[in-house]
Every structure is written in structure tokens, then in C-alpha cells.
């Protein structure tokens, strides 16, 4: 598990894990390396690592409530903060989910479980030369995902606009056409 605060991005966590020799995977999304780990988890984001449900991988959180008081899980409040980091369900009612997609508090910290890096990772890229091939490709992808659970970690379909959004800032207004779109 790793504990992060607002502003820690996928890229920052990847650098930290690499620099410290930790063989764990970053819970990545299709949003790219500048995406916030905490924000994505609170929005119930998902990704292509074994812990694909990012909020599902959150084991503990800390938040500031509207009256200025702090929310911590029951295990945390009982003086067992380390246990709270490791045991998601704690004791008593589970209320951490109230802080997802809501305004019940400002989450200042989450602890999230990371999956170990596999012995090997392979990436397969393919191109569909025609839009007509998308539907049969999606059907085949569904088939592969159901036949290879645990082996095939995830599929991420992207077009050039998606790749551009992940790797470059949004273009200035002067670079867009009259409809506000990027020219081909």
C-alpha cells in the first residue's frame, strides 16, 4: 500500500516507486501521467492494472468535514492507524464511500493498495484501417477478456485525439477550426 495526498500524479508515483526500487504497478488510467491518483480514486475511476477499480483499492482515507473537524476511519481513531491502512473494512459501519463523487468533505489523504509488477508485461498495438472494423474488433476483445482472465490485463481503445489528449496540452484557440475542433 502507499499513502498519497492531493496532487500526487500517476507519473510522480511511478518515479517514486522506480527510484526506491519498489516492484509495484501504478494504478494508471487512460488520462496519462498527470492524472491525480487521489482524484481518480474518489471519482471511482478505473484502469488497466490488476486493481482496475481504483476506489476499490483504497484501504483508508482522511478528510476534513464542513465544520472543520477531521474524519478518520474507526480503526484510525482507535489508535491503530497502521491497521487502518491495511484493512479497508475496519470496524463498525463503512462510510468511506460517502466521500466519493460527493461534497461531504475534502479528502486530504488516501491509502491505496498497489499490485505487484508481473514478471513480464507485453503490449499489443493494432490499427483498424476502417471504422467498419471497430464492431468486430470490440466483439473479439470481449471474447479475449473472458477467455484470458488474469492474463489479459486490460484493453484500451484510443484514436489519435485520445493519444494527443494524454500527451500534449490542449491546443490554443488559434489552432482550432470554427467549430472549436482540431483540424484533421
What kind of feature is each model-predicted range?
Residues 162-181:
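Short glycine/threonine-rich loop-to-helix capping motif typified by GTGT followed
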Residues 24-28, 135-138, 144-165:
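Flexible, glycine/charged-enriched surface loops at secondary-structure junctions
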Residues 6, 11-141:
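FAD-binding subdomain of flavoenzyme oxidoreductases
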Residues 58, 182-184:
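Phosphate/diphosphate-binding loops
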Residues 1:
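Glycine-rich N-terminal segment of FAD-binding domains in flavoprotein oxidoreductases
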